[in-house]
């Protein structure tokens, strides 16, 4: 592997007072981090409406401005270093935001981040999206842009970062307060400070592919280095953290190794510092001893990728310390002219504030004036220590680097015709006030009930809505809500209208799922029993039909004339039912349509709901400068891609098989694109048609399904479908770029949704 790391000059190391025994390195092109870091700060503050300063660029004498990632990942691939820098600064700025935000604000940010991190390509995740303003959606676009940048560079390793970040997010945000020793503290702090994420960022940055089993083998050795990073971070961040705590009434106690030692070990602040100095040295020494032992087991040397991984862990320790010495993010006690801190009666305070306190003392002066031997002797003989350094100092590492022209004319005509009668139409509602009250009871509204999911959860257990409530408990990818939010980034629909449109689309989608499962004889939905298997076919048909009544009630809430909304809904629902009729006809008669007819069916069936969504959003849009823009070609391509991808994944995806069963479309007798291509090409067409025509109700025998899939592979139908999907992927991105240009804004959220569905 090429080397990009360069040793930091000896004179710079010497003047820094570095304690680490490892040799610090810096990226040979470390200056490329400066602009990404500054840009991320601006990007974050604009998205979050904050005025935070990351202070991640340290002015190191002899080097100039250096970002922590250039020291912690000195051998990072140059083309990946800017993206790593931006992501690291995002995590750091987010940490600062948590310090000033309310808990409900923090939880919302975390929820948005989790949604951005979820892998939408795997069925089974459960997401919820609430309608929001442009201000609310800006953070989501920022998060999506960061994830997208990493995925574009290396999707596999990027998803490892996202998975680790998602798993540790709650611990990183809300640290526990029941850790009494450093042995308890260190492992938790390692996660809290983002070092597990940093480990995946290292692999991404350097392009290292290390198996989970090899990472597990290396973990004890690497964790020792990570614990040393935590000690370094806690030592240098303590003055800032305790200052913030003491000056912020009601704030949480600092989650810091110094605090653990003072609160639960009975140590003074200087004693806690001395213990942590000794602990850093001990951790580094034990790391080297265990590394030597591991190498001996492996014949004297680890494989190159593993050696690079461990080497980076060492450089991260000393790099973290060198950066901490000079960064403005961590002013020293001397910089702050901060008195010694003590812990008395369950609270921290400055010694100068205590009764009979003497002169202010700066801890850095008192600690550094003691010889190393005195530090070690005092620690080893201290009666306050319940055990060894290991017992007292088990502190987890805290990394400082973690971060339609025709369509519009049509709508305009309708609006003009009904402008004078709009109020009358609304007054002459098709639904009586009594009926509307009944509907409101079945799907309640009110404070806190801002999403379709929350309204369903609050709905009564009435038979007419029970199948819908059941569907809401099943896993969902949430793609439609994300799609609506992403389009709204361009169209700027009022919040109440956006919420209503999401509800309408969700209602119609649920209705179609219930009816589809009945019409397709499906017994499973997302790995669970289909609704009609629980509530009965007749009851589910009634519930699905009742949804249309509720949709009419929701349409009345929109700001555009009711006649416009009803016209749009009627036209697109007609398309949906026409498409479904073709699909059912081909299945019942085992009739193989042409590829063109199949595409038209998808455009009607799948595209109907997408177009309904887009047209309602356009009708409610507050923008007047985009009336001549037409997103329908993009929507058509997206609909085709969604359905054909589903056809393909149903036959080849292990994840789909786990959720739905192997080749479930064949159980239903569905005429999908791979089946059409197979029947057009295979010499065994008569045999396959025979299997399909003589299929009995219920699942197809596994041997028959395996036979048909083998024939698909032999004749190239599956490969042709895959190639078609890959071409569609390129067309979708090209169409997205056109729309971004027309609307005048990038749409990272929409692109991320697309790319996570890609077929490789």
UniProtKB/Swiss-Prot annotation:
One of the record's GO molecular function terms: prenyltransferase activity
Keyword hit for Metal-binding: yes
Family: In the N-terminal section; belongs to the terpene synthase family.
Keywords, alphabetical: Isoprene biosynthesis, Lyase, Magnesium, Metal-binding, Multifunctional enzyme, Repeat, Transferase
Protein name: Colleterpenol synthase
Reported function: Bifunctional terpene synthase that converts dimethylallyl diphosphate (DMAPP) and isopentenyl diphosphate (IPP) into colleterpenol as a single product. The C-terminal prenyltransferase (PT) domain of CgCS catalyzes formation of hexaprenyl diphosphate (HexPP), whereas the N-terminal terpene cyclase (TC) domain catalyzes the cyclization of HexPP to colleterpenol.
Binding sites annotated in the UniProt record for Mg(2+) 4: 516, 520
Entry binding sites for Mg(2+) 3: 516, 520
Binding residues annotated for Mg(2+) 1, in chain numbering: 95
Region (Disordered): 359-400
Subunit structure: Hexamer.
Catalysed reactions, as listed in the record: 5 isopentenyl diphosphate + dimethylallyl diphosphate = all-trans-hexaprenyl diphosphate + 5 diphosphate; all-trans-hexaprenyl diphosphate + H2O = colleterpenol + diphosphate
Annotated stretches, region: Terpene cyclase: 14-335
Keyword Transferase: yes
Region feature (Prenyltransferase): 336-759
Motif (NSE/DTE): 233-241
Residues involved in isopentenyl diphosphate binding: 477, 480, 509, 526
Gene3D superfamilies in alphabetical order: Farnesyl Diphosphate Synthase (1.10.600.10)
GO biological process: alcohol biosynthetic process; isoprenoid biosynthetic process; mycotoxin biosynthetic process
Biased composition (Polar residues): 391-400
Domain of life: Eukaryota
